[in-house]
Each structure stands twice: as C-alpha cells, then as structure tokens.
Amino acid sequence: MPERNPSNQELPLSAVVYTIFLCILFGSNTVAVKIAFSGLGVFTTAAIRFSTAAAAIFLWARVTERTIALKKGQFKQVMIFSMLFTVQLSLFYLGLSKSNASRGALLANLLPFFILFLAHFFIPGDRITRRKFFGILLGFTGVVFMFLDEQAVQAGFHTGDLIILCAVMVWACATVYLKRIISTFPPFQVVLYSTMFSVPLFFLGALLWDDALVFQLNAPVIVAMLYQSLITASFGFVAWNTMLKKYGAVSLHSFVFIMPIAGVALGGLLLGEPITLKIILALIFIVSGIFVVHWHPKKEAPAYPIRREI
C-alpha cells in the first residue's frame, strides 16, 4: 500500500476552521507589536518577545522530550540563519515603529513573492512559472498603490515602509537558506537557537538606541507582549508545524491570504488606522497575488527556465 502524502490531503472542516484561526492570529501580530510600542522601546519589545518565546519553546521541547542538542556541523548553519533572523527582525521592528500595523501586515505578506524569486535561482525544482510570475506582478502592483497613498506621504510612513521592505527581503533570504538546510534537523531547533542568538543583541540594541526601555506598562501593553511571545511565536509555531506535518504545505498555504486581511482589518478596528481606497486596492492586489501563487493546477510550464547551479 503506498504511503500517504500529507500534501495531497483535503482538510476536514475542523482543520479548515483551525487553519483560518491560525492565519488570523499571525495576521494580527503587527497590531500587537504596535500596541507594545506604546509602552516599550522598539528593541526592548523584540528582546522581551523573543526571550519569552525562547523560554516557552525550550520548555515545550523538554516536556515533549525533543532533542535540543545540535549535531556535528549544524552549529554553523544555525548561526548563519540566526544572523539573518536578527537583522530581519531588527529592520522589521524599526520599520514598523515608523509606519502603521495595516501597512506592515501588507508588506510582510510580500514574503512569498520574494521567496519565489530567490528560490527560482537557489532552490532546485522551485521555478517561477507563468502563473507564479503573474501572482508576483499582482503583489507588487499592490505595493505601488501603497506608496501612492496620499495619507501615507503626509504621515511620513514611506521611510518605515522602505525599512519593512528591506526586512522582508532579508526574511526571504533567510527562508530560502532555511529551505536548503531544514532537512538536517527539526524546525523547532532553528527557531529555538535563532531566538536565543538574537535576544542578547536585541537587549544591546535596546540599551543603545531605545530612548527608554519601558515608559508605560499597562494592561494593553502586557497583553500585546504575551500575545506576541506565547501565541504567535510559541503556540503558533508549534500549531502551524503540527498542521503542516499532518496535512502538508499545499493545503495550509491555500489560506495564507487571510493574514493580510486580518492585519488590515484589525489595524483599522483596534488602532483606528485609516483604511483608504489605495490601501483597499493594495490589499486586493496582494491577496489576489497570494491566491494565484498558491493555486495548484495539475500541470504548468515554467515561464523562464534557466540554469540554476550555485
């Protein structure tokens, strides 16, 4: 009897609801970050979030008797990823402090498009097809609408948006590198060691560049930090990877378009951020691009087949 391929499984209704729930959790993370910024410094927020997440993942690994120690030759790989991870998060948090949550959510969800482009050159078998190329065009058309938004120009958001774009590009590089090495060890080890590596650097950044580490500690700030640390960075990681192992990437990635919708909607509802016509158009184009990229017809030809030896 042939072995069942999880990537080919259809999700039952309960799994569909659970996946949608996870996508909403991830999509609303930028809102939680912005709320935390109202009481904590930029790098202080990152340091607290990932130190808490590292502790939670470490305890989860111990309770579930996962192997924490790295094998020979893995340390260098994890350190390379950890450096990219730290740069990525530093840029993202800095950029988000100069923009708003809904714009950050939209820009963060350009990640699949950057990954597709890099994977075309560096991951054997991952080629940009005509369909994917069209999806990329849709996604970046959405970015054009974002930068044409008059209210964003008046508010001075473009600097933050550009920093977030740089963060997403570094994030894509880290993801493509991770795809090349991930088969050699459990995913949780990468997350655990990268967060442990980044925390001292985030605290150093907080001491050097945050005007104040803590300037207002109230219930919304505490809840926002717990949400980032325990819900998205800890529970979200375990839950998503559990679903990924059970049902496969194809099934789960069909729902990622929900993330930017959640980010924009909650940014407007909870933070009172303006949802302008151009933001709505940007959302439509980016969500459409994600949907096109993750739609899987049976056969498709590569748009620009090239040699990709490294």
Identify the residue ranges that each predicted region occupies:
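Membrane-interface helix-cap regions at the ends of transmembrane helices
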Residues: 28, 35, 39, 53-71, ...
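Hydrophobic transmembrane alpha-helices of multi-pass small-molecule transport proteins
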Residues: 57, 79, 117-118, 131-149, ...
